[in-house]
Design a protein with these regions (language model features):
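C-terminal, well-structured catalytic/ligand-binding subdomain of enzymes
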Residues: 1-59, 64-65, 69, 74-104, ...
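Short, well-structured alpha-helical segments that form the helix of a local strand-helix-strand
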Residues: 109-120, 192
Length: 192
């Protein structure tokens, strides 16, 4: 079971179906406002008014999705002024391109974690985020970046606050804590 809400107010959303030649087919959700935001005027603005160009760009801007192997991934924002800007000798990747990489190439949580560990992550649009990743075996983790270190937490639920132990734990909105508590209560009360 993997669920995610898409509660952006007044946004244009797109469901993207992908069938890469070398990788897993997937469905993903894209907030199209992220693609067209801050484009301005001129050639780029005119190009992004084309449905074909927006659809092509959407392929590389997923916020969540599931692939044919049963891997599901979602990005959740955390209300924090910190940003993810890893800086090692690994190749750079942004939040949304990381999701596309995982959907295309990872068939399990372990494979997803191995892939993420090969890159320096940079938060798209400077936002602090964490990932919910689950697979067909029922394994479910949160991947958080605290002080630019990747931390993996085994958890069946993720909302919009840090789960990792340490000084950041719990930072996020009160509403995200309420949703987390409600979901955990429901899960614990549901027979398996």
């Amino acid at each position: 079971l993997f669920g995610r809400n898409f509660d952006w107010q007044n946004c244009e959303a797109m469901i993207v179906e992908s069938h890469p030649e070398e990788g897993y087919a997937s469905l993903s959700t894209v907030n199209m406002d992220f693609i067209t935001q801050n484009v301005g005027v001129g050639m780029m603005s005119a190009a992004l008014n084309s449905d074909e160009i927006k659809t092509l760009a959407a392929l590389y801007a997923p916020l969540d999705g599931m692939n044919e192997a049963g891997l599901a991934v979602s990005v959740n924002m955390i209300q924090d002024n910190a940003a993810i800007e890893q800086d090692t000798d690994r190749p750079d990747i942004t939040t949304t391109t990381a999701i596309r990489l995982l959907l295309d190439k990872a068939g399990s949580v372990d494979e997803a974690l191995e892939l993420l560990g090969q890159y320096d992550l940079h938060g798209s649009m400077g936002m602090m985020v964490h990932f919910a990743i689950a697979d067909s075996t029922g394994r479910s983790v949160a991947v958080e970046y605290v002080d630019n270190d990747m931390i993996v937490i085994e958890t069946p639920v993720l909302t919009n606050f840090y789960l990792a132990a340490g000084e950041k734990q719990g930072i996020g909105t009160a509403q995200s804590h309420e949703r987390y508590d409600m979901l955990m209560h429901r899960l614990e009360a549901t027979p398996r």
